[in-house]
Amino acid sequence: MLRISIDSIKQFGSFVPGYNNTSYHAAGRAIRTSSLYSTMISANPRRCLHSSKLLNKEGQEEGYNEQLISKMSSQNGSNSRQNESEGKKEGKASSVKSLLQHTHSHSHTHMHDNPLLSLNVQQIKKNPGVRITWIGLASNVGMAVGKFVGGITFHSQALLADSVHALSDLVSDFLTLFSVQYASRKPTSEYPYGYGKVETVGSLAVSTILAMAGISIGWSSLCAIVGPVIPHAILESMAGLIGETHSHSQSLTQQATNVNAVWIAAGSILVKEWVFQATKKVAIQTNSNVLMANAWHHRVDSLTSLVALVAITSSYFFNIQSLDNLGGLVVSGLIIKTGGQGILSSLKELVDQSIPPTDPRYLEIESVIKDSIGSLKTDLDLKQSLHVRDLTILASGPNLRATTTLEVPVLHSGQEVGIRFLENAISTIREDLRMKVPNVGKVDVEFVDVTSDSKGDLEHSHDTKSTNHTHTHSDSADTHTHKH
C-alpha cells in the first residue's frame, strides 16, 4: 500500500497561501485515494474495473479535493514567479511529488509473475517449442494407453514393456516443457545473462533419462540372449544392481503373441517418427538443445516400437524369438550413444566451454562483425579498417554471448581514435548482430592499439595500467566505455 508521511504533507502545505487543517485533511485524503488506485492498477490490472467502481462513489467529494490541490499548486506557482525565495519552497513540493513517484515505482517492481508450466492458449501458440512439446506429451499419453490396452488384449509382453517406457517419457516431456518455457524469460538485474542455463540443465536431465532407458533395454536384451548359458541365479543377482527389466524379454519368449498387435506397433512408429521430425525442426529453428534431446527421445520410442514389431512378426511367422533380443541390443547402443552425447554437450555448456571456430554459429557471428567494422573505415581517415584479434562465443541454452577484441589502427594524421568513434563502432556491431543473428544476447567488445603484439599484452595491460587499451561492455540496456 502506498503511504506518504504526515510530516511530508505538512511541509507541502506550510508554504501554500490559504492552507489550513481542513485543507490538510482533504489533501491527505485525496492523495491516499489516488495513490491507492494507482498502486492497484500497477499491481493487478484486472481488478481496476472493480476498484474504479468503488472509488466512483466518492468521486464528487474527492474531485473537490483534487481541485483544491490543483488550486493550491497554481497559487504556489504564481507566488514563486513573484518571489525567488518561494522557489525554494516549491522545491519542497516537488520533493514530495518525487517521493510519491519513487514509492509507486518501488511497489510496482515486486509484482512480476513467475510462470512455470502454463496451459495458456496464447503461450502455446506463441512459443513453438512449448507447442511441439505439448503435442509430444499428448502423443506419449495416447501411445502409453494404446500399448497397454493392446498388450493385454493381444498378449504382447513387448507392447506392455513399451507402454511402461512411454509413461517414463512423460517425465522427459515435463522437464523439456519446464526448461523451454523458463529459459525464454527475459534477463533481469539478478540474472543479467538470462535463464538459458536452465534449458542446459533440462537437456542434461533429458539426456540422462535417455541413456538410462538405453541401458535398461540393453540389459533386458542381454539377459535374454545369455540366459541359456549363464546360470539364472547369477543373472538375478546382477539384475538386482540395475533393475529387474529382463523379465519382459524372458516372458516374451514364453507367451504367444496375437499378430494383430503389429498394427499398434506400426501406428506407434508412424506417430513417433512424425513427432521426431517436427520436434527436430523446431529445435533447429530455435537453437534449443533440450528440444533436440527430446526429439531424439521420440526417435528412440519409434525404434523400440520397431523392435516390438519385429518381435511380434518373427515370433508369429518364423517362431524366432531371438531377433527381438538382437534388435534390442542394437537399439540400446544407439540410445546410449545419443544420450551420452547429450550429457557431454550439456556438461561442456554448463562449464562455459567456448564454441570452436569451426562451428557454423562462430563463423556466422565472425562474418557479421567483420562486415560491420569494414563499413566503419570510411567514417574516419583510417589507414586500415578495424581488425578482429580475438572472438569468444559462449552458449547459454538457445542464446549466445559474444566477446571480441578489436585492433584499432591510427589515423593518417597520426592522431588517436576518439571515444565517440569507439562507441559508434560497438553500437554498429551490436545492431548488426541482433539483426542478423537473433539469438545473440550480451556482447562485450575490447579495443586495443594496433601496436600491441599479442593477446597476452592485452591481459597484462589490466595490471600495468596501459594507456592504449579501451574496454567496452554492450548489452540490451546500454554501452559503457572505459579507456585506460
Swiss-Prot record:
Cysteine-cysteine disulfides: none
Annotated region described as Disordered, given as residue ranges: 73-114, 453-484
GO terms classed as biological process: intracellular iron ion homeostasis; iron ion transport
Skewed-composition ranges (Basic and acidic residues): 83-92
Transit peptide: 1-56
A Pfam family per the record: Cation_efflux
NCBIfam families, sorted: CDF
Protein name: Mitochondrial metal transporter 2
Organism for this UniProt entry: Saccharomyces cerevisiae (strain ATCC 204508 / S288c) (Baker's yeast)
